[in-house]
């Protein structure tokens, strides 16, 4: 993988809300729905990509890119998945999620 990356750290103060599905910015960025739509460009295409960028335009702390891969960083352990599931690691205090474009 190469290209620009986005690092997102989610602290414990947000995690309980995110795990419950409260629609915080952090939840929206990591939700399975958004990742599926961004990962499968062959199905949704460039027009959908533009719509997603427009929908997220108000989030000034996020550089919006057509992200395809996600890498979890939980201490020294990392795992690459196409779909992010934040419920997989409920005991960690924070997540640094690195998304990299192809």
Model regions: which residues?
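Catalytic phosphate/metal-binding cores of nucleic-acid and nucleotide-processing enzymes, i.e., regions
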Residues: 1-102
